[in-house]
Amino acid sequence: MTLPSDTTLALISWLASIDTPQLQTLIKRRRIAHSACTSFRTLAEELLSAENIRESLRELPRAHLLAPTTPEGAEPESLRALEAAAFLSSTPGGHSYLVPRSALSALDTLDDRASEPRHTPAADLSEGDRGAGASTGLTLVVSVSDLLDAVANARFPVGAEGKPTATSLKSLHAELGAGYDIAVLWDIATEAGLLGTNGSAAALTTQALTWRDLSDSARYALLAQSWWAHVPSWLAATMTAHPDMSWDSTLIDHVRYHYPLVDPDSGIQSLRADAELLGIIRQSIPTPWAQALWRGEDVARAFAASSPAYAPGVFAHDDYTLLATGPLAPDHRSVLASITARELGGLVPRYRMTSSSVLNALQDGVSPESVPQLLREVCVNDVPASMIALADDVARRALDLEVHSHGESTTLVTRRDTLSEELISDPGLIVLGLKRTGDCELTC
């Protein structure tokens, strides 16, 4: 094993001198992988890697980046930040570098005479734009809810990184219907702590179970806050300082000045797309609930103030479809998901009642007599007789057969004399070896 360099030894000594909270803060700030924290030496070597130093410097503001060139005249706050990031060590006798001076060569090109750009607040969004932004956010909430419902009701294998397999994606598209970007929704739900894994399959987390009891505005706040917690520190600091700043050249100029090692053009482009998907910004202007997020205020309340009104229910038609004329409240979506099949997702969905959907409801514990009542609760018009007849017919046929398990044997009790004969003569059931043990009873 090669001996560590003098620089590595000095950094190891410094690491050993700081306390545990400081060490934990350093590891988090410099984004050190757990695998590199097995010893002070492995940690020091990772802190001294050129890539880690380069990425860490990118996140430091101008004032901190200028401090290493003249530490004696730097602000105490900047020196503390550099020491917390393991770039400088401060002692009563002065300051010393914890990394090679050559690793900080990018700082020599900084212009310490550059002028800070003027901040001009963005214009207020119109009522229509606020409503459109809220609709975008609510669409995301509904789509994530639909994804969680699908994962709760079926098994979807995942790959090594917790991503859905190609087969799972295909199954989810078939389950959810048109209008969903499964990959994007999966990432958002995972980032929010709603999706995890159980072995080789996707699974809901404890937080996902709590999600079901939240209002749509509280759900939105959770998604927005989770996303914002993962954005680069330079963006978080900029918007916290100026919550009303537009995401156009104004933001780019401010980032370029305050974080001179960041390339804002490429970085902000992808972040802007995410922010638009979440309804954080509308036409590059921050929404009121985005500003509430950056000011530490009530995001859910600000979002609810601009959210579109819920439709009173759905319109049922003779062809077994149920159409919404606007966003549906969570309780209406829950009822419809329990007894119908969703044909079109999104903010204004379309459902269809089928024999399979009614049978699934009965198997999930919905009583036969409650199906018509549930339909009346969510429909704004009279429930067509065809829907009631379908529910009654499926319930009647489902109740024609009872299955009971007794140790190693299974008993089938039929309520129609002819059903017993049908089951015995069914070629697909020959493998069960059904035997008649009574007028309406079979055993296998």
Language model features: what each stretch is:
Residues A224-C444:
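Extended alpha-helical interface modules used as scaffolds for assembling large macromolecular complexes
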Residues M1-L261:
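Short, amphipathic alpha-helical interface elements at domain boundaries
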